[in-house]
Amino acid sequence: METLAAINRWLAKQHVVTWCVHHEGELWCANAFYYYDPDRVAFYVLSEDKTRHAQMTGTRAKVAGTINGQPKNVALIRGVQFQGEIRRLEGEESDSMRRQYTRRFPVALALSAPVWEIRPDELKFTDNTLGFGKKLHWLRAE
């Protein structure tokens, strides 16, 4: 649990996620601001259905991605890699996460884009501030 707590603290300070989906032999990546729910260990993003990545995702797909800062000093590099699933939320679940998202990013109140949940099954946190190449791993217990 200490590993997840360390990862959660760092993720709460970031705001952009990159994720990639695969469909019929094609890969595509996207970036978005995210709301992170540490209790669910999930990211929430807004993205229009007409985007290439949303069309490739359908309502649910496997996903992989990263979240990272941009330090110039290698000793300060920190970042998360993940793999899991992305799905489009509907109904009350969507409404609830939209409220959380717009609390963090009020400008999103003007958007009607669907809410998507990225639910990692695995997180790998590289934190060079703990020592060069230090990795913390977390796996979702099913």
UniProtKB/Swiss-Prot annotation:
Classification via InterPro entries: Split_barrel_FMN-bd (IPR012349), UPF0306 (IPR011194)
Residues annotated as signal peptide: none
Domain of life: Bacteria
HAMAP family reported in the protein's UniProt record: UPF0306
Family: Belongs to the UPF0306 family.
Protein name listed in UniProt: UPF0306 protein Ent638_3591
Species per Swiss-Prot/TrEMBL record: Enterobacter sp. (strain 638)
Species lineage: Bacteria, Pseudomonadati, Pseudomonadota, Gammaproteobacteria, Enterobacterales
